[in-house]
Amino acid sequence: MLILLPAVDVVDGRAVRLVQGKAGSETEYGSALDAALGWQRDGAEWIHLVDLDAAFGRGSNRELLAEVVGKLDVRVELSGGIRDDDSLAAALATGCARVNLGTAALENPQWCARAIGEHGDKVAVGLDVQIIDGQHRLRGRGWETDGGDLWEVLERLERQGCSRYVVTDVTKDGTLGGPNLDLLGAVADRTDAPVIASGGVSSLDDLRAIATLTGRGVEGAIVGKALYAGRFTLPQALAAVAE
């Protein structure tokens, strides 16, 4: 069954949603802790918790994220600004179930390989993809920089033994424009590691569509704006993927 991960994106201690990851496009939804506890109460088994300040290189919410993880009974995937030994150690020390590496996996392949080697399935890699003139390009640093060709980087990560990928079509994220099923399927077909879908989910039908890819290796879906915007409730979403 498809695992759902409600997203809590944190800016300055508050839960927000961005459009296409752009700073300044935030809509605020209250305290990060309240948001996370709300999803837990609604039946989430995982929370996707993102430090957007750290991702954009403008500070961090490290203490707050540790507090949030500590107060939750469910598993947390922690993301945002994890790009060196110090930030990785701090993220893992929160007690989260796993961390997502983004920019670091693109800019520092040797460090990324070591992190994967040392921490195994506690480390996932985020692949933020933008399709430009038919080419699948990766985006780094809050999607501001080009991180190379998706398929070349995926091949390298496969050699390094990456245990899980979080795949985002950045043109879809926060837009409620529907997920990129072709991209998800293509990545899942090229790896034996599980793939988590991120970006664009707008309806229960979108979740049902992603759920059809579980046989190809798509394990979960991160859901953000659709939940916050009231397109559906988390209990409705959990029921839809269990059908």
Curated annotation (Swiss-Prot):
<comment type="pathway">
    <text>Amino-acid biosynthesis; L-histidine biosynthesis; L-histidine from 5-phospho-alpha-D-ribose 1-diphosphate: step 4/9.</text>
</comment>
<comment type="function">
    <text>Involved in both the histidine and tryptophan biosynthetic pathways.</text>
</comment>
<keyword id="KW-0822">Tryptophan biosynthesis</keyword>
<dbReference type="InterPro" id="IPR013785">
    <property type="entry name" value="Aldolase_TIM"/>
</dbReference>
<dbReference type="InterPro" id="IPR010188">
    <property type="entry name" value="HisA/PriA_Actinobacteria"/>
</dbReference>
<protein>
    <recommendedName>
        <fullName>Phosphoribosyl isomerase A</fullName>
        <ecNumber>5.3.1.16</ecNumber>
        <ecNumber>5.3.1.24</ecNumber>
    </recommendedName>
</protein>
<dbReference type="Pfam" id="PF00977">
    <property type="entry name" value="His_biosynth"/>
</dbReference>
<feature type="active site" description="Proton acceptor">
    <location>
        <position position="9"/>
    </location>
</feature>
<feature type="active site" description="Proton donor">
    <location>
        <position position="128"/>
    </location>
</feature>
<dbReference type="GO" id="GO:0003949">
    <property type="term" value="F:1-(5-phosphoribosyl)-5-[(5-phosphoribosylamino)methylideneamino]imidazole-4-carboxamide isomerase activity"/>
</dbReference>
<dbReference type="GO" id="GO:0000105">
    <property type="term" value="P:L-histidine biosynthetic process"/>
</dbReference>
<dbReference type="InterPro" id="IPR023016">
    <property type="entry name" value="Isoase_HisA-like_bact"/>
</dbReference>
<keyword id="KW-0368">Histidine biosynthesis</keyword>
<dbReference type="InterPro" id="IPR006062">
    <property type="entry name" value="His_biosynth"/>
</dbReference>
<dbReference type="GO" id="GO:0005737">
    <property type="term" value="C:cytoplasm"/>
</dbReference>
<keyword id="KW-0963">Cytoplasm</keyword>
<comment type="similarity">
    <text>Belongs to the HisA/HisF family.</text>
</comment>
<keyword id="KW-0413">Isomerase</keyword>
<comment type="pathway">
    <text>Amino-acid biosynthesis; L-tryptophan biosynthesis; L-tryptophan from chorismate: step 3/5.</text>
</comment>
<dbReference type="InterPro" id="IPR011060">
    <property type="entry name" value="RibuloseP-bd_barrel"/>
</dbReference>
<dbReference type="InterPro" id="IPR044524">
    <property type="entry name" value="Isoase_HisA-like"/>
</dbReference>
<dbReference type="GO" id="GO:0004640">
    <property type="term" value="F:phosphoribosylanthranilate isomerase activity"/>
</dbReference>
<keyword id="KW-0028">Amino-acid biosynthesis</keyword>
<dbReference type="GO" id="GO:0000162">
    <property type="term" value="P:L-tryptophan biosynthetic process"/>
</dbReference>
<keyword id="KW-0057">Aromatic amino acid biosynthesis</keyword>
